[in-house]
């Protein structure tokens, strides 16, 4: 899982900038709205909404914004109707891309995504062209300062831990079955262990290692996609060589 850990590290470094752009709140609002639309506005019976609300609060979203997003999803307030569409394709160095969107205009969205990918000499593929390379998993970034590795493993093994990556300097990257994500969060909460960004990710079965030039191009491509208004999240099977990591850090 080292490739996933390295990419998670890079994405965390981008997070502060993304929040300044306002992108983060926009994505969170759309996720809350869609979750409420699909499963109702009561988080106790809607796990997806519960997770979206946890992430919104962790990022200091005002309660007023949260409630308005829920009510738009349930139809209690008028608002834009979003549909979820997933696109698949390839980027620099042959990396696979899964692009999840929430849009009110699919023609605009696919045109924007195709333009961004083509600009990087990538290509947009058919549905299923790369998704077979990935599996959806629950992921939690646990602060290393809040628990030792052995303690964390002991706590999470009972909650269904599948993998624990320790490569990052600040965080353990926990991989768990989606159905066990909430029980893992509860186990951490019960022990007072601090974590960030509990989420569902698409984890690749295998990684494509990129050298410096392609790595820089790939990160710029993913950054451009994630800054597109309709894109919620981008998954890839990037692995970075040591030289590439140094180039990205510089």
Curated annotation (Swiss-Prot):
- The signal sequence is none
Compartments where located: Cytoplasm
Protein's name in the database: Probable transcriptional regulatory protein Paes_0496
* Keywords, in A-Z order: Cytoplasm, DNA-binding, Transcription, Transcription regulation
* Keyword Ribosomal protein part of the UniProt annotation: no
Query: Pfam families this protein is in?
Result: TACO1_YebC_N, Transcrip_reg
According to its UniProt record, where is this protein mainly located? cytoplasm
Question: SUPFAM superfamilies attached here?
Answer: YebC-like
According to its UniProt entry, the protein's GO biological process terms are: regulation of DNA-templated transcription
A single Gene Ontology MF term assigned here is:
DNA binding
* Record-linked HAMAP family: Transcrip_reg_TACO1
Q: Which InterPro entries match?
A: Integrase-like_N, TACO1_YebC-like_2nd/3rd_dom, TACO1_YebC_N, Transcrip_reg_TACO1-like, Transcrip_reg_TACO1-like_dom3, YebC-like
Disulphide bridges, residue numbers: none
Q: Which PANTHER family match?
A: TRANSCRIPTIONAL REGULATORY PROTEIN YEBC-RELATED (PTHR12532:SF6), TRANSLATIONAL ACTIVATOR OF CYTOCHROME C OXIDASE 1 (PTHR12532)
Q: Name one GO cellular component term.
A: cytosol
Among its keywords, does the record have Cytoplasm? yes
UniProt family annotation: Belongs to the TACO1 family.
């Amino acid at each position: 899982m080292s490739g996933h850990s390295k990419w998670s590290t890079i994405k965390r470094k981008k997070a502060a900038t993304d929040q300044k752009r306002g992108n983060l709140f926009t994505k969170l609002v759309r996720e809350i709205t869609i979750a409420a639309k699909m499963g109702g506005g009561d988080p106790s019976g809607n796990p997806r909404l519960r997770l979206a609300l946890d992430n919104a609060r962790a990022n200091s979203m005002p309660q007023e914004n949260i409630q308005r997003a829920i009510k738009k999803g349930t139809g209690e307030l008028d608002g834009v109707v979003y549909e979820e569409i997933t696109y698949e394709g390839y980027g620099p160095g042959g990396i696979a891309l899964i692009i999840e969107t929430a849009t009110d205009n699919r023609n605009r969205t696919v045109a924007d995504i195709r333009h961004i990918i083509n600009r990087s000499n990538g290509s947009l593929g058919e549905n299923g062209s790369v998704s077979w390379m990935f599996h959806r998993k629950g992921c939690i970034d646990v602060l290393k300062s809040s628990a030792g590795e052995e303690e964390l493993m002991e706590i999470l093994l009972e909650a269904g831990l599948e993998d624990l990556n320790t490569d990052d300097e600040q965080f353990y990257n926990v991989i768990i079955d989606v159905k066990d994500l909430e029980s893992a969060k509860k186990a951490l909460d019960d022990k007072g262990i601090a974590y960030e960004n509990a989420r569902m990710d698409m984890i690749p079965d295998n990684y494509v290692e990129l050298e410096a030039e392609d790595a820089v191009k790939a990160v710029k491509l993913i950054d451009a996609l994630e800054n597109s208004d309709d894109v919620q999240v981008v998954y890839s099977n990037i692995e970075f060589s040591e030289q590439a990591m140094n180039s990205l850090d510089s």
